[in-house]
């Protein structure tokens, strides 16, 4: 009787241990896959300058904006503002006047990343982090994007202001043309071990 009881107890314990081990292995595998996907997305990001005329779905636009707002922010002030521009006249006008944003003529939309100077004096740092998040989200969603600067060039800032109606305290950091890439494009391998220094330069 007791032998049967102990035998059953051993079997139950073995099952519990095996199940726990399998669950831990599964969690480890999921963590590995997640980290691999994140790192691959970072390394595969590229600046896209040629686009299809295909429109971008609203849920993807929302996903990019959420990614932007998930960026780190000094003292959690979150000084960013985002203007989603789909107006054809505005896109073409900015394309004509911004020297490195000519591709705006072929994209369905652009996101203008701006900073509120009344919330933070280092808004441009927080907004740069938000911009990178948007670029990475675009890559993950199968979209193309490129960072085109407005700040700190006063003439470019004025162009963006004229086309987006920004108040004086809101400064555009950059204009991000976004759309579906026109054909495959390969990311550059930018890693350079000569730029890495340990403890001292």
Q: Model features per residue range: what roles?
A:
Residues 1-201:
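Acidic, surface-exposed loops and disordered segments
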